[in-house]
Each structure stands twice: as structure tokens, then as C-alpha cells.
Amino acid sequence: MAKLHFRPYIPNQTVLFPQRIDENIAATDPVRIVNAVIDNLNLESFKKLYKETGRCPYHPKMMLKVIIYAYMNNIYSCRKIEKYLLRDIHYIWLAGNEHPDFITINRFRNRVKEEINNVFTQLVLVLADKGFISLDVEYIDGTKIESKANKYTFVWRKTVERNRTRLMDKIRILLEQVDEAIAQENSIKDTSVEFTPCRLSDIVDELKEALERQPATKDKEEKKALRKKKKQVMELEGYRDKLIEYDNHLDTLGERNSYSKTDPGATFMRMKEDAMKYGQTKPGYNLQIGTENQFITDFRLFPNPTDTLTLIPFFHSFQYRYNRLPNICVADSGYGSEENYRFMQENGIEAFIKYNYFHKEQRPRYTPNPFHAESLHYNAQEDYYVCPMGQHMNRIGTKRDKTASGYITESDRYKAKRCEGCPLRGSCFKARGNRIIEVNHRLNQYKRQARERLLSEEGIKHRGRRCIEPEAVFGQMKYNMAYRRFRHMGEDKVTMDFAFFAIAFNIKKMCAKLIKEGKGLITVAKYMFMGLFITRYNWNIATCCQMHEEKAA
């Protein structure tokens, strides 16, 4: 009978010659791409973050490699990164056998919250230079990401303004009761007067001086009245402190309607993830990203729950980052407004952006409403509409409306003459008098242009790709990479965290594309990044970084 033999098992076996740490790391492992990419990025701006004296800090390239590789593997906790630096060979190799603790890792992230944006810009320019993207086409979409703040820490603008108005009334009534002379001097009976904390402090000081000047008395009634006035002065001080609190709330709100006490940068919005199905609001940010070939090319956070007002600031962010604008923009109907169409037309951007009811118009069974203003015949030369009964609707004026961004829209108003007794009146309109319609000719022209572009061969191609561009990125981000909620408080820290994620996402996507094409990662890494900053490309990035520093100054 044969004897059973096992392979030698000696955990404490020593070797004659020392081994390299990366001997057990495959040549096709994505960790090598991370190492090659970060080694060839320009991190000169990081040096100004460190002091020349004191203990030598960890090298920023090492810290950057470790954090980005952790983000690529869905690890966002500094404590988990610290743990992997002790047990995972990939992290040990990237760190050069260094072991920074979780506090050091977190401090590094917070320290580079401004410079990390330049790193993201450099990486995108590398991708553009190597043909992964062109920066000519921008697929834009947004999603709401919940903040780390508690959901019940809300501050509402309407509540603050209502309570502040009530507080003003209480202050006026109290001042009338305290001292009639001071009340007359400060016009407290005039309800249009607004009290400020500084003015209330002066009044409190004046009242205290007046009370101190009063002579001592033994009369019980006078003592009681004096105690009452002192109590009222203390109450007035409490009102002053409350007024300061309300003013601070309004300053923090800015143009928003709400914010969170624990994360003042977060705004309360309705999220798609609503378990109770009653429209609960949660603190969060509206994350807008631009993608091309499923790479993140730009991103920005907004407090707006809707996407309409975010497009123009997003283009400004793109221009600030790359010193140019894209040639083509593709987005859904949430961005289809007159202001956005006009901005893109004036800046030479070809807009493939849907408008409201575009999909409804493309349905086979769709029939336009014959009584709708857009279905009526319009005589452009004489500027009048013809109603379904054949009578003219002449122009009677222009209506101007102001949007939330301050943009002025103009709508021409047309009125019919004889609507009484019309057999179609019940179907045409139900208001009293003659029918009046409002038509925005400029917006209708933009819609016609958008319809022509969207129905063209190129428009159909872009519409098809829009579904697999930003939507695919959001799907990868939320479900495959478990990035569903921000882990920091404050807009600057949240922006920093997503910049790390965007860098990791783009490198991971690049690795996936190279593997799909059957190319060796280490060979491609050497080809892509060897001498990158010795060529003309170094000048482009240096110019971009210099432009950022000048604008920041």
C-alpha cells in the first residue's frame, strides 16, 4: 500500500536571498497601472503643503497611490486602509513597506483637498492625449447623493423668516413696556423699522444705565417695578441672541431654502431612495458629472434639487479646468431651458438636449392638441395667430418673467376678439372673456432646432449613447463600487472625497479597457507614461495648473 505524502509545509521557512515585495504580484494587476500613473504625474504643488522643518512626512506619491488604490477596491475608510497596509501585499508594495496610521491618512486627504482637483485634471488630460477621450463631446447628467448629516437636522428658510418676523413684533411690544421714552426715540411703533443685533445691544446698554441711575428705594411697589424692568431687559437680551441666531441661519442659507445643522453645505432634497413613499427630504448634494466613453471628465456639486440651473455653471467649471468648452453637449430634458439653449448657441456648443414632451411627440399614437398655442397657425409677417374658428388673434403686449437665475424670458400675448357664442369654446378654453395665449417665440425656435438635431442621424447616435454614458457611471458608482453616500461634512471635503473617487474610477475604467483589448498593463503603462512631462504635454498641464493658480489668486 502506497504511503500518503503531503507537500512540504514550513511557515517559518527562510530564504538565502531577500525577495522583492512585488514578486508575487501579477504583471497584469491594476496596482501596477496605479503605480505608473501616479509616478508620472506632476505633484510639485503638493510641496507647499509641507514644512521644511520637523519630522520628515510620508511621501505624497505614496499616500496618493494607497488611497486611490483603496478607492478602486471600494475601500473608503481610513481605518480599513490602515489594516490593509499591514496584511495586503498590494498595499504593502505601493506603500514601500511604510505603515501610516488612519489619522495620518485622513489628515493627508484633508490637506490635499484643493490640489487633488489638479491631479484629476492631469489624469483626464492624459486620457485625452492617449486617445481614450477627446473632450469634444460631453454627456452630462446629475444624481442626488445623501450627505453624512442626520436627516432630522433641517433648517427651513420659511420657518426662520416667519419666526424672525414674530420676534420683531415681540421686541417692539417689549420695548414699549420697558421705557416709553426710549421707545419713542427708536420709533418702535413704526412696524417697518428693522432691529439689528447691534441696535438692540445699544438699547440694552442704555436701559441698564437708566436702571442703575435710579435711586434706591424702600417702597415695595417701586422695588417690584424695578425687578420687572430688569427682567424685561434680560428678556430683551435673549431676543437679541435669538435674532443673531436667525441672522446666522439666513447667512448660511444664502439663496437656498434649507440646510442641515451638522452639514451646512447640504440641502434637503427628495431622493429616489424613499422607503416610506411619502416624499421624505434628506440632506444631500446634487452631483453633476460630465462623461465621455464612460470616463468622468468633470464634476461639480450643487445645492439645486433640479438640473436646469446647473448646466451653465457646469460649463464654467469645465472651461476653468481645461481652458476650453466642449463642441457637443448631450443631456436629458431636465436641462432644456431657454437660458441653457441660448448659452450654448452663443458659445458655439452644438446642443443635443431634449425638451419637455419630446418623447411624447415621438410616440406613434401621438396627436397634437389642435387648440394648443403651438398647433395654431401663425403669420410671422403680420404677427398674429389664427384660432380653430378662423379669427385672428392679434398681439396685445409682452410679458416678462424672471427665472431663479435672474434670466429674463419674454412671452408675446395674443388675444382673440369674439369668443362669445363660439361652438368650440368649451374645447378651446374655459376662462371668462376672450381667449389670451402667451407664446415664447425664442424658446419655440430653440425647440425646433433641438428637434431637428435630435431626429438627425447624429442625434439618434448621441441619444443612444447618453443612456450608457452617465447612467452607466452612476450605476457603477452606486451599486458596484458602493459609493451611495458621502462620508464627509462640508462642500469642500465632499468635493475632495469625490475627486479621489473620480481619479480611482477613471484608472479602473482604463485598466478594464486595456484588459478587454488584450494589452499587458505594465507594458502599456510604460508606453503611456514614460517621459510624459518631457514632451509638449508637460507644457499643457503646467499651463493649466498655472492658470488655476492665477484664477485662485
Please place each PLM-identified region on the residue numbering.
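Basic, short loop/linker segments at the boundary and entry of helix-turn-helix/winged-helix-like folds
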Residues: 26-68, 441
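Intrinsic-disorder/low-complexity peptide segments enriched for small residues
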Residues: 2, 14, 39-41, 62, ...
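Hydrophobic alpha-helical membrane-insertion signals
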Residues: 1-31
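Anion-binding and metal-coordination hotspots
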Residues: 8, 56, 67, 74-87, ...
